[in-house]
């Protein structure tokens, strides 16, 4: 898969599912998040437990909390160094395409996630949020690593 900057097309609607290993010692698993390109306007939407989050206990949905492609910290107790991120999969299109519909849903309805106040290691977690969004669009198939523990929490 190409890198994010190589795939980015500011004339299209694109939804990227990004990943990064989670902090050591759990870095076998990966953390997923959405990067939305709405014809040149880029947003990062994710769910998780983050230090510095404005939510109670650090658990919640975040929009643009971190730069679009910034990976997770390598250790729980330090902000740096960070793992790199990668594109797990993406979809693109023009107005009224599945990419447009998915991008619009993530931007407008991410706060409707039913478990936005719950976080557990095996789920619900960041990957469960991505799985919940994708479940709303059964016509869209994304290839995501089996290391995304919690992705199928809603199935």
Identify what each model region corresponds to.
Residues 1-122, 154-155:
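Non-catalytic ligand/cofactor/substrate-binding and regulatory segments of enzyme domains
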